């Protein structure tokens, strides 16, 4: 069982533990906790119906129970999504991630925990996302970057960490990995005799990268 903030409701703690049991990554569980804590704070503010209050005035959601959750409908959720867009300036990709968090939470409450009679997020739609072209460095830019990492002009800690930094940049360039994937590398992921690095991708998918 994981330890979570004392001011979040037991229902949310149970949901986070459920995801930990499914072997979801710590990063994913942290996102769920952040997204759902803010969502529940907003809904609590919405139900208070006091225009003098703001979401910052909601200091705790520990008292939220199944009765409260049964009172949430689809319009409440869309009100929260509008708040994220208009007041928080969240980009479509950020709002889409939060939609996924909310849908997963209510699906758990309805089908697994059986704490709510209906799933208000079942018909919740995600913002449309424009296609983003991948950004990449040219061969010349990559070469210059690696050259600068090994520059003799570096001093102090920069000089001491030259080999580490060179290895990090090389992995980024050659494997196209994310920062979260890089920091998750364990010594057991490296086969030195075969020059193979196993990268753990999203959804626990694995990719082998060759290195020299």
Q: Where would I find each of the regions flagged by the language model?
A:
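Conserved catalytic core of the tyrosine transesterase superfamily
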Residues: 1-212
């Amino acid at each position: 069982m994981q330890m979570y903030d004392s001011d979040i409701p037991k229902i949310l703690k149970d949901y986070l533990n459920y995801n930990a049991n499914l072997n979801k990554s710590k990063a994913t569980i942290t996102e769920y906790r952040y997204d759902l804590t803010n969502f529940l704070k907003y809904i609590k503010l919405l139900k208070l119906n006091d225009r003098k209050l703001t979401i910052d005035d909601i200091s705790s959601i520990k008292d939220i129970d199944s009765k409260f959750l049964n009172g949430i409908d689809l319009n409440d959720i869309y009100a929260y999504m509008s708040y994220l867009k208009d007041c928080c300036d969240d980009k479509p990709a950020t709002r889409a991630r939060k939609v996924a968090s909310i849908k997963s939470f209510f699906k758990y409450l309805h089908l697994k925990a059986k704490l709510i009679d209906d799933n208000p997020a079942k018909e919740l739609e995600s913002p449309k996302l424009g296609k983003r072209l991948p950004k990449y460095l040219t061969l010349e830019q990559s070469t210059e970057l690696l050259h600068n990492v090994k520059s003799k002009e570096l001093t102090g800690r920069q000089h001491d960490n030259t080999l580490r930094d060179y290895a990090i940049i090389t992995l980024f360039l050659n494997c196209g990995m994310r920062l979260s994937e890089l920091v998750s590398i364990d010594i057991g992921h490296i086969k030195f005799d075969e020059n193979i690095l196993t990268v753990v991708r999203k959804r626990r998918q694995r990719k082998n990268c060759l290195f020299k």
